[in-house]
Amino acid sequence: MRAEIIAVGTEILTGQIVNTNAQFLSEKMAELGIDIYFQTAVGDNEERLLSLLDIASQRSQLVILCGGLGPTEDDLTKQTLAKFLGKSLTVDLLASRKLDRFFASRPQFARTPNNERQAQLVEGSIPLQNLTGLAVGGIVTSKGVQYMVLPGPPSELKPMVMEQVVPILSNNGTKLYSRVLRFFGIGESQLVTILEDIIKNQTDPTIAPYAKVGEVTLRLSTKAENQDEADFKLDSLEKEILALKTLDNRKLKDLLYGYGDNNSMARTVLELLKVQNKTITAAESLTAGLFQSQLAEFSGASQVFNGGFTTYSMEAKSQLLGIPKKKLQEYGVVSHFTAEAMAQQARQLLKADFGIGLTGVAGPDELEGYPAGTVFIGIATPEGVSSIKVSIGGKSRSDVRHISTLHAFDLVRRALLKI
């Protein structure tokens, strides 16, 4: 089904409010297998809204109008839609009774004729009762096009959509099912390059890449009658994707760290540690506790994480971790030696299975001759200690710190999975 959203309200065009309803509705319609082709905002003007309705009626099967259902003269959505369709306005009995109760319980408010506008419906509409407000919504069909009228305030629109609109539109047949694959260690441009043939020939399912700070996600989407049918199609596409290799011959499946919109590298590592009954600690310099903070963000972190160290200065590294100051001066705080020593000392001091050491140059200035974005990450395990050097150039100080923690978590992930 082709659909479009028309947001009615001059306050949207003047930037006084943000049109969050469009994002919410687009997401919900997509879940129902309804394709939003257009989004438009129009002011509180009858002539312009009539013009837009004329355009929408010729290109869409479902037209969703948000806003303009209030009691004032500039709330003209239902009135304009009725005029466009050549229909009259009727009063919805339930909405009218709600107005009665509202004003009966608030004698300090005067009820005026304008208030009755909130209980009006376009003739022939299926009413959508407003659970958190006074203005009734509705769905009316004319010449093969459905018109849905919804209130503007999100606190009124969202309950109406979730509790009334979704059940009505769920009979549409197919729904949209999605699966999000999360990758670390490859950029969006390279991922799109190696997926070029698949993307070029895609029909259903489809692939949508998204670049995030330090990682890339792929959203696989398909329309299906049920979850089993969707899983069959998505499993096949995922298998085809993960069989590929990067331009430098790494297995793409090894760069996949998790699934879902709300997942993260920290959550993935936490769950792996819990499953394997392992513990972890960290000593951080440039990240200043960010690694530990991300780990502790999730419930159950205390099962695998007892604490750690933030050792920003050379003195702190020496005093708290017991790393000889002469060695730090010899090798420098930005070095493989220091990253490994931090990881090893932290692991031994807190008797953890894994220790992480993070040191480097967050920026913007150089340190010890290294440019901003130079990071050394050490990992200590029962099998030994090692480290990597990462160059995160052209990023803000905040991004350097965040991406550094992703690399650290990935080291732990690979160690746990023995990749």
Curated annotation (Swiss-Prot):
NCBIfam families registered for this protein in UniProt: cinA_nterm, PncC_domain, PRK00549.1
Species classification: Bacteria, Bacillati, Bacillota, Bacilli, Lactobacillales
Disulfide cysteine pairs (residue numbers): none
One Pfam family of this chain: CinA_KH
PANTHER family the UniProt entry points to: NICOTINAMIDE-NUCLEOTIDE AMIDOHYDROLASE PNCC, NMN AMIDOHYDROLASE-LIKE PROTEIN YFAY
Family assignment from sequence similarity: Belongs to the CinA family.
UniProt name for this protein: Putative competence-damage inducible protein
SMART domains: MoCF_biosynth
